[in-house]
Amino acid sequence: MQQYVYDIVINHGQFFDGSCRDGSIRHLGIRDGRVVTISDVPLPDHAAPKVYDATGQWVTPGFIETHSHYDAEVIATPSLKESVRHGVTSVLIGSCSISMINAQPEDCSDLFTRVEAVPREAVLPILKEKKTWRDAAGYRGFYDRQPLGPNMGSFVGHSDIRVAVMGLERATSPAKPSEQELQKMESLLEEALDAGCVGMSLMTTRLDKVDGDRAWSRPLPSTYARWNEFKRLFRILRRRNAVMQGAPDAVKKVNVVRFLWQAHGLFRRPMKCSMLTALDLKSNPWLNVVTRLSGFVANRFLRGNFRWQTLPAPFTLYLSGLNVNAFEEFSSGELLRDYKDEDAMYAKVDDPAFRKLFKKHVNALFTKGLWHRDFSDCWVVDCPDTSLIGKNFEEIGAVEGKDAVDAYFDLAVQYRNDLRWKTNYGNHRPEIMHKLLASPYTHVGFADSGAHLESIAQYNFPLRLLKYVRDADEAGLPFMSVAEGVNAVTADLA
């Protein structure tokens, strides 16, 4: 029987090692899942049972996704094929304060399903069957036994910790945790880091709401925490050199200053911070400048280790009927989202008084968050009335003598979730997106794989980045080299 030196040989590819060094033609030998030989000359065909000719192709390290929501999917389907087939070989879960480590199965489901737009009826049975662990060591042990597709890492979610200590109802109320409860939270964070979690994720934007019957439509538990609670946990992250992944208030935004200060490294070790998110938003065209400037201040003046996550793609969402998470940004929209009964929700938008209030809030200048609230930039992509496909709600309303909001509501009432439409929140200007991607104060993330399954699909984000890099170079407008692009989705994230 023939003895092979390698499992796989890849010859003649342009090899990028993940650093910012330019690629060069190299020949790779892989054994037991690791690159063991990088040769200047081709490796022989008889050295491995699988030999690939990569002439004219790039050979790179596996890509890393630092912001996914595969927490439920990986329990049921650990292969995560959709990411792996796009070259992603390492994935982090536990983002946005939500992990499935410490809390009870129903608590974990209620924290996760509405926020990440994954059906509760799919997630809860999986957790009830599979979640036999109650702590980080058990969580780690579960994954050690799974046939994982990519490498897996996790944050521990602050909402998960809070619910495990205080219970769901108290954790989603103004109740202050006792000293004993704060000490227990600290202990759970230490245990998570001991088990291999990379850090803790938290949330301060109150747009994401809890599912289920017990705390329906309350903001995530992490949003109820006071800064004293955060600071106690931050001290542990700083001492352990672990990562804090956080999100400032998406509407008010001012609390980002507190995050900047917490990250500082003046006369102490800086806390590693990965913050959501640096986008070129239509609702705030200058926000991209503010995020880059804040990164400069945090890292240069405050000596921090602070990065904004940014997305290498237009931030376009596909939506159904009235199922619009951005409605949480203003009170009348929040009222709609609070309805658990779909019939009652659709009946509400038939109320003229409600429509008047909704239009007032849509046109308000000082409460805009992520969404631009421009219904002339909301386009029908599928509808039983096929004549509407490709038109925006303002165009549809003009034909019928209605304004855009009335046109939208009337169609939503008539067709409900059969009305599919899309809108772009941001990253619509390639030249600004390029600046965000090239900034030393951002890193590539925010793909949200495993969540919002009917709205977004950014599984291929590393490949999109590399295509933007190549296209810009071919157009004579380079914003980073191919080697820097590979670095941005590999070593820079590691």
Task: Identify the residue ranges that each predicted region occupies.
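Histidine-rich, glycine-flanked metal-binding segment
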Residues: 2-8, 15-62
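Active-site His/acidic residue clusters
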Residues: 212-215
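Divalent metal-coordination and catalytic microenvironments
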Residues: 13, 33, 56, 67, ...
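C-terminal amphipathic alpha-helical interaction region
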Residues: 464, 477-492
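Active-site neighborhoods of metal-dependent hydrolases
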Residues: 139-143, 149-151, 155-168, 173-181, ...
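Short, ordered loop/turn segments at secondary-structure junctions
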Residues: 41, 96-98, 205, 449
